[in-house]
Amino acid sequence: KPRVTEPSRRTESVVVAAVNPRKNIEFYCLSVLIRKPDLVYRLDRKLEEFGLSPLATEDFEYTDHQLLFNVLRQAMGQDEKDHAQYVFSQIPEDLAPLVNELLAQTEKLESPDDKLLEDLLARFLDLRRFHAMSNVTQLKFMQDDEQQQGGENIKVYIEQTMRFTRLLNGLDQAKLKLSKRQA
């Protein structure tokens, strides 16, 4: 008699991954950065090479992830302690379970820093793309609503849509350059 519990578990995890890929990507990125906080500076430099802004709290959608990234950013801004040591000393108590999960995910992290850097860069570009696409979609709905109500503020929505469209272009160009480097 086949076991029913195994397939249902697999299906359940696939559904969770399909429902929220952004959370999984954020989780992975933080799991690497918590182990190797020095990669934050290197990621910032790479993003700037592509004409993009450095990593920011806004790159993360989830509050816990934002709080943890703020601790990482603070660690990079101080030079009294080793960056990793600083991070672990400043993590709020309520984030300890999240940090333990992150550390467990990357317990056997053995990739060279350059490979991790390229991987993280690609994932942060994806996160920014998800965010920008979501904003463009919302703005289009708002623009349609505004147009139906007389269109007094439509110019604002058009300008914001154009800004996110330019960002999407920049992200696509960066992703293309990155994929050429990896080839």
Which residues does each PLM region occupy?
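Non-catalytic protein-protein interaction segments used by genome-maintenance enzymes to assemble
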Residues: 1-80, 100-101, 105, 136
